């Protein structure tokens, strides 16, 4: 069962908003044979120009579903978030079920329901079943700090840069966010 943690910035989360979010995003449960125990982290932020930003993150066992949307209409934004999350689940479901069938395991996700196929509009310009890697590169990771990695990324004109963090000796990634600022992903072994 998906539980919800809903937080509002500059906005009070009313029962109507909470119910709408839970109803829409809760429909993702229909894609699973065994509904996972998961917590959907939902953050709703309003800006001075009345635009809203909705972020939803659902960490599952082997994948994290995440979608973000800005919209002038909160409810329309929630609908768009739901569509993005459903596309992510369908893509992931297809890959996992194919691997499960090849190994003879029980499928983790349910098969496509007829009503979902009828109501769905496919916004993807490519086949969800086929992942094609068109280019592969190999390079050595150089030890540096995150600031130097950002400079290297900008020099190369890339949106991300992989490097060995000099402080932790682990692999890290810096990336350019949509807002123009930078993010850092640090890896760890489990």
From Swiss-Prot:
Biological processes annotated in GO:
negative regulation of translational elongation
Protein localization: Cytoplasm
Show the GO MF annotations: ribosomal small subunit binding
Q: Does the keyword Cytoplasm apply?
A: yes
Q: Please state the protein's primary subcellular location.
A: cytoplasm
Protein keywords: Cytoplasm, Translation regulation
GO cellular component: a single term: cytosolic small ribosomal subunit
- Superkingdom: Bacteria
The record, for Pfam families, names: Ribosom_S30AE_C, Ribosomal_S30AE
Q: Which Gene3D superfamilies match?
A: Ribosome hibernation promotion factor-like, Sigma 54 modulation/S30EA ribosomal protein, C-terminal domain
Q: Which InterPro entries match?
A: HPF/YfiA_ribosome-assoc, HPF_long/plastid, RHF-like, RHF/RaiA, Ribosom_S30AE_C, Ribosom_S30AE_C_sf
The family assignment reads: Belongs to the HPF/YfiA ribosome-associated protein family. Long HPF subfamily.
Function (record text): Required for dimerization of active 70S ribosomes into 100S ribosomes; when added to monomeric 70S ribosomes stimulates formation of 100S dimeric ribosomes. Unlike E.coli, 100S ribosomes are present during exponential growth, peak during early stationary phase and then decrease (shown for strain NBRC 3060).
Q: Which NCBIfam families match?
A: yfiA (TIGR00741)
Give the record's subunit note: Interacts with 100S ribosomes during exponential growth, as 100S ribosomes decrease (after 7 hours) also found associated with 70S ribosomes.
The name of this protein is: Ribosome hibernation promotion factor
Species for this entry:
Staphylococcus aureus (strain NCTC 8325 / PS 47)
Q: Which gene encodes it?
A: hpf
């Amino acid at each position: 069962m998906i539980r919800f943690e809903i937080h509002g910035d500059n906005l009070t989360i009313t029962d109507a908003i909470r119910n709408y979010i839970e109803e829409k995003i809760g429909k993702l449960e229909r894609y699973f044979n065994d509904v996972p125990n998961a917590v959907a982290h939902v953050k709703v932020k309003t800006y001075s120009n009345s635009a809203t930003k909705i972020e939803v993150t659902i960490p599952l066992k082997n994948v994290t579903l995440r979608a973000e949307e800005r919209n002038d209409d909160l409810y329309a934004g929630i609908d768009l978030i739901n569509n993005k999350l459903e596309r992510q689940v369908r893509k992931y479901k297809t890959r996992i079920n194919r691997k499960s069938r090849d190994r003879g395991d029980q499928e983790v996700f349910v098969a496509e329901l007829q009503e979902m196929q009828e109501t769905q509009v496919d916004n993807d310009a490519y086949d969800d079943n086929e992942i094609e890697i068109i280019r592969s590169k190999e390079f050595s990771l150089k030890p540096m700090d995150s600031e130097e990695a950002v400079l290297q990324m900008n020099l190369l004109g890339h949106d991300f840069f992989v490097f060995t963090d000099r402080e932790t000796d682990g692999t890290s990634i810096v990336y350019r966010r949509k807002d123009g600022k930078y993010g850092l992903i640090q890896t760890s072994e489990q």
